[in-house]
From Swiss-Prot:
One of its GO terms (biological process) is tRNA splicing, via endonucleolytic cleavage and ligation. This is RNA-splicing ligase RtcB homolog. The keyword Ribonucleoprotein does not apply. Its cofactor is Mn(2+). PROSITE patterns: UPF0027. Transmembrane segments: none annotated. Belongs to the RtcB family. It catalyses: a 3'-end 3'-phospho-ribonucleotide-RNA + a 5'-end dephospho-ribonucleoside-RNA + GTP = a ribonucleotidyl-ribonucleotide-RNA + GMP + diphosphate; a 3'-end 2',3'-cyclophospho-ribonucleotide-RNA + a 5'-end dephospho-ribonucleoside-RNA + GTP + H2O = a ribonucleotidyl-ribonucleotide-RNA + GMP + diphosphate + H(+). Mn(2+) 2 binds at residues 122, 259, 353.
Length: 505
């Protein structure tokens, strides 16, 4: 007999103004409890989704986010909590905005492609410049067009960076080092990438021929969906010390944010792994609550193959963002008749939003090696952590939070509290409030474009009819999401950026 909404809510316990606990029993076989972070505005969305599901008993679509967080807590080898960040919404298997860590020393511990997502190493990078808003405003339309001309965008877009089959093999294994070798990146860019832009366990042999075929023409392309390149202006500085370390010292300074991932290649790596893991689950008798949570023991051949292929796709995504950085620097140099160097177009940081990584964490009084899955969530390591660059040792790792089209973005920094509560993880963006299909039904793309124009935002878009899927109305309020993380102490606000021009697929 299905439980009523009231019965379901009896398993959810408020821990603080910004956190709830999901008690064992909410779904079967939970190994650990769940936890999610929300404020009062986001709380209504989360509970309404559960209420609607209880009424309809889950006809079609994904499970509610809170159920997905709990189902992840039932996976073998999970430790700590299954954590939902404030931008959490339902996704394939894991919710988007879900973090889960698995103890590598436990033979039953698993890796799940649904915990990384189809767009492996979808992520964001932020470049600063020495330009002011007043320098850009007179040439804003020309600059937006120059970016649109330089960066290939849209669903089937093909790259302009020359790449043969051998180059692709190298890029899959070398990441940003390939971009450096080929002259598409600056040496300092590598320092300011998560993992220094290269996952060493990558093995191009574990990326299928079909995935490579999809990836070969797409290098240096933005893709569609919520991917974008955005010219932004510093709107607010909350932490002057951290901002100065990032080269941001006043309001009105111009930055560029690039949001993209591993395109069709990453999607194929995930698809291939899910097929292999279904078989491995039968063989190893792994039981899960939701078949979308297909997984394999970390130490199994399927688990290892996926981790090596995923690392290759992650490296491809870093090369992709590096290539677009190269094209962005060219676009700016052309419009301002200068050089990227003279424009001070330095990379502040590059973070991943969809990835699984082996990390050392302190848990139950001892150091443990964990496989941390972050899907729609961002690594946020604290000051003095050995894995963050020298430049940010005193501030904590920069965390880049992209808003939705036409809304603000934020730069946060990692904290010690985040390290203990969420294994050094925070939110990644606004998080969807309306499905893509609902957005298309409810919103008119011309209204969305006019709204952006009224805000003084130039837009160049390859598929105007897809614009309403990415309209601000389709998403949660990014400020609510960021403020929740800030008040929970799992990351701290440093800088707020507002858009003045957007390039989209």
């Amino acid at each position: 007999m299905p439980r009523s909404y009231k019965e379901e809510c009896s398993f959810l316990e408020r821990l603080s103004d910004s956190a709830f606990l999901i008690k064992k029993g909410f779904v079967p076989n939970m190994k650990v409890e769940g936890k999610f972070y929300i404020n009062e505005h986001l709380e209504k969305l989360m509970f309404d989704e559960l209420r609607h599901w209880c009424g309809a008993q889950g006809i079609g679509g994904f499970l509610p986010g809170v159920k997905q967080i709990a189902n992840v807590a039932a996976l073998p080898g999970i430790v700590g909590y299954s954590v939902g960040l404030p931008d959490v919404h339902s996704g394939y298997g894991f919710a988007i905005g879900n973090m889960a860590a698995f103890d590598m020393s436990l033979p039953e511990a698993v890796v799940s492609p649904g915990g990384v997502g189809f767009d492996i190493n979808c992520g964001v990078r932020l470049l600063r410049t020495n330009l002011e808003e007043k320098d850009v405003q007179p040439v804003k339309e020309r600059l937006a067009q120059s970016l649109f001309d330089h960066i290939p965008v849209g669903v089937g877009s093909k790259g302009v960076i020359p790449m043969g089959a051998k180059d692709l093999e190298d890029a899959l294994e070398m990441g940003v080092d390939w971009s450096l070798r080929e002259g598409y990146a600056w040496a300092e860019d590598k320092e300011h990438c998560e993992e220094y832009g290269r996952m060493l366990q990558a093995d191009s042999a574990k990326v299928s021929a079909k995935a490579k075929k999809r990836g070969l023409p797409q290098l240096g392309t933005l893709g569609a969906g919520n991917h974008y390149a955005e010219i932004q202006v510093v709107d607010e500085i909350y932490n002057e010390f951290a901002a100065k370390k990032m080269g941001i010292d006043h309001k009105g300074q111009v930055c560029v944010m690039i949001h993209s991932g591993s395109r069709g290649l990453g999607h194929q790596v995930a698809t291939d792994a899910l097929v292999a893991m279904e078989k491995a689950m039968k063989r190893d008798k792994i039981e899960v609550n939701d078949r979308q949570l297909a997984c394999a023991h970390i130490k199994s051949p399927e688990g290892q193959d996926y981790l090596k292929g995923m690392a290759g796709a992650a490296n491809y995504a870093w090369v992709n963002r590096s290539s677009m950085t190269f094209l962005t620097r060219q676009a700016f140099a052309k419009v301002f008749n200068s050089t990227p160097d003279d424009l001070d177009m330095h990379l502040i940081y590059d973070v991943s939003h969809n990835i699984a990584k082996v990390e050392e964490h302190f848990l139950d009084g001892r150091q443990r090696q964990l496989l941390v899955h972050r899907k729609g969530s961002t690594r946020a390591f604290p000051p003095h952590h050995p894995l963050i660059p020298v430049d940010y040792q005193l501030t904590g790792q920069p965390v880049l939070i992209g808003g939705t089209m036409g809304t603000c973005s934020y730069v946060l920094t990692g904290t010690e509290k985040g390290m203990t509560e969420t294994f050094g993880t925070t939110c990644h963006g606004a998080g969807r409030a309306l499905s893509r299909a609902k957005s298309r039904r409810n919103l008119d793309y011309q209204d969305v474009l006019e709204n952006l124009a009224q805000k003084g935002i130039s837009i160049r878009v390859a598929s105007p009819k897809l614009v309403m899927e990415e309209a601000p109305e389709s998403y949660k309020n990014v400020t609510d999401v960021v403020d929740t993380c800030h008040s929970a102490g799992i990351s701290k606000k440093a800088i707020k950026l507002r858009p003045i021009a957007v390039i989209k697929g």
